[in-house]
Curated annotation (Swiss-Prot):
Family note: Belongs to the type-B carboxylesterase/lipase family.
Source organism: Rattus norvegicus
Compartments it resides in: Microsome; Endoplasmic reticulum
InterPro entries documented for this protein: AB_hydrolase_fold, CarbesteraseB, Carboxylesterase_B_AS, Carboxylesterase_B_CS, Type-B_Carboxylest/Lipase
Main location: other
GO biological process: retinoid metabolic process
Active site positions, chain numbering: 230, 347, 459
Protein name: Acylcarnitine hydrolase
Catalytic activity: all-trans-retinyl hexadecanoate + H2O = all-trans-retinol + hexadecanoate + H(+); an O-acyl-(R)-carnitine + H2O = (R)-carnitine + a fatty acid + H(+)
Length: 561
């Protein structure tokens, strides 16, 4: 299942990224510079030429939206940025937040890691990037799309969201934000000494900054759409249900990530805080002492602790998340904003198993070890061990073919982690505001020779299509069919940002998700279908909980005897 990038594609990718990092798209001259005023000072951006177009884009990079979260502000809510005098340079990519970029090795992106190693890393990382069409000015009132990057809440940076082409082609403003990651972003003691969710609070601060300042860049603060993939989608979904984010945005796009993703939300902070306390060597008997000890650690020491976490959950902190996301959704305690919610066909194909360290388990799966693997899997899902048999019956059937078992296991994990949570959130939200649901089905041509033939769309495969062939600031080569798919997807996303509805003349019609359960299959030939994974949804939301209830009842009766 390990994914190796084809050399020709990788070379093009790395060369493209290198060009961006040394920033040579446009000539830095007085004529191409641009100055905008924010509430804390002036910033000079740059007019760049967007490749493959005749258009220009103004880029403003590394604008601070909060104070550096260091010293006493480590494990504390973000504070407003300090004003500056003179004109701040906004032509260099900001330092990324502290993170373990060695994770890129684990997903087969070693060469990319080498390039990214040249980008500075710092705790002082609460910055955002802005991309605007060259003609945009105060009063343009263009729709705004705020990109929240993914990366399991432990890795990523604003520069992953290269909004150049999207801004120019669709005449809107794109903002890409950074937020604290890993332990620095989500450590919690579960009490007033460190409530947690610092990364989410950073995102709220960035959205407030957008409300205050985006008009100076040609954006409309009353037409803000937040969007993201994976943990970015989870972030977007969490803002929909958080009282702290109310009024800061008007539309939400969640790509393969919602607030119910099991690995990114936890009722309790205990597991993470115990691990952090143990690894840090802070022999603290209480929360206050532990937080004081952790604040005294160097960035390098924090990075060592971070390496243990392949992902890190947000917590129910009583403030950003007053209750568990499922409770907030079920009690209709959320902002009724229009949403696009979607998943990919093969969410657990390639990238996620490598991150989670399960690729080898899948590769070695056979009828002989299936029962043991499913028992372990059930335990990881926090299900009773007896549920392993139910999972086998639902997904594996009676087949002995190892390849079929591996495919079915991957489908099961993709459903549990991504598809079922997305459908649940869509069903909760649709009675209060329009929800447009999609399944991205296209197998990217540039992975044709490196993935199994049955695989269509892996986790995050849609991202380059949304940004017009750009991903992580790199350019991928599309076929003509893929260029059309990308243009359509950019148009759907931009229409939604403009009007809260993705449809317009010349696009295949995308129906709203109502009781007909219609959704759009996003491929080179888009099509409308009904009731995505209806049987699997029934299994996870009705059959399995009922069985668990029966098991608990039987155990209770047995205990009473």
């Amino acid at each position: 299942m390990a994914r190796k990038q084809p050399h020709s594609w990788l070379n093009a990718v790395l060369f493209g990224l290198l060009l961006i990092l040394i920033h040579v798209w446009g000539q830095d001259s007085p004529e191409s510079s641009s100055i905008r005023t924010t509430h804390t000072g002036q910033v000079r951006g740059k007019l760049d030429h967007v490749r493959d177009t005749k258009a220009g884009v103004h880029t403003f990079l590394g604008i601070p939206f909060a104070k550096a979260p260091v010293g006493p502000l480590r494990f504390a809510p973000p504070e407003d940025p300090e004003p500056w005098s003179g004109v701040r340079d906004g032509t260099s990519h900001p330092a990324m937040c502290l993170q373990n970029i060695d994770m890129l090795d684990e997903v087969g992106l070693t060469d990319m890691k080498m390039i990214l190693s040249s980008i500075p890393m710092s705790e002082d990382c609460l910055y955002l990037n802005i991309y605007t069409p060259a003609h945009a000015h105060e009063g343009s009132n263009l729709p705004v799309m705020v990109c929240i990057h993914g990366g399991a809440l432990v890795i990523g940076m604003a520069s992953m969201c290269d909004g150049s082409l999207l801004a120019v082609n669709e005449d809107l403003v794109v903002v890409a934000i950074q937020y604290r990651l890993g332990v620095l972003g989500f450590f919690s003691t579960g009490d007033e000494h460190a409530r947690g969710n610092w990364g989410y609070l950073d995102q709220v601060a960035a959205l407030r900054w957008v409300q205050q300042n985006i008009a100076h860049f040609g954006g409309n603060p009353n037409r803000v759409t937040i969007f993201g993939v994976s943990a970015g989608g989870t972030s977007v979904s969490s803002h929909v249900i958080s009282p702290m984010s109310q009024g800061l945005f008007h539309g939400a796009i969640m790509e393969s990530g919602v607030a119910l993703l099991p690995d990114l939300i936890s009722e309790t902070s205990e597991t993470v805080s115990t691990t952090v306390a143990k690894l840090s060597g802070c022999e603290a008997t209480d929360s206050e002492t532990l937080v004081r000890c952790l604040r005294a650690k160097s960035g390098a020491e924090i990075l060592v602790i971070n390496k243990v976490f392949k992902m890190i959950p947000a917590v129910v902190d009583g403030e950003f998340l007053p209750r568990h996301p499922k409770e907030l959704l079920a009690s209709e305690d959320f902002h009724p904003v229009p949403s696009i919610i979607g998943v990919n066909t093969d969410e657990y194909c390639c990238t996620i198993p490598m991150v989670m360290g399960t690729a080898q388990i899948i590769k070695e799966l056979s009828r002989e070890n299936l029962q043991a693997v499913l028992k372990d899997t059930a335990a990881q899902m926090m299900l009773p061990p007896e549920c392993g048999d139910l999972l086998m019956e639902e997904y594996m059937g009676n087949t002995d073919d190892p390849q079929t078992l591996q495919i079915q296991y991957a489908e099961m994990m993709g459903d549990f982690l991504f598809v079922i949570p997305a459908l649940q959130v869509a069903h909760f939200q649709r009675s209060h505001a329009p929800v447009y649901f999609y399944e991205f089905q296209h197998a990217p041509s540039y992975f044709k020779n490196v993935r199994p033939p049955h695989v269509k769309a892996d986790h995050a495969d849609e991202v380059p299509f949304v940004f017009g062939s750009f991903f992580w600031g790199i350019k991928v080569d599309f076929t003509e069919e893929e260029k059309l798919l990308s243009r359509r997807m950019m148009k759907y996303w931009a229409n939604f940002a403009r009007h809260g509805n993705p449809n317009s003349e010349g696009l295949p019609y995308w129906p709203v998700l109502d009781h007909d359960e219609q959704y759009l299959q996003l491929d080179t030939q888009p099509a409308v279908d009904r009731a995505l994974k209806a049987r699997r949804l029934q299994f996870w939301t009705k059959t399995l909980p009922q069985k668990i209830q029966e098991l608990n009842g039987a155990q209770k009766n047995h205990a009473e005897l």
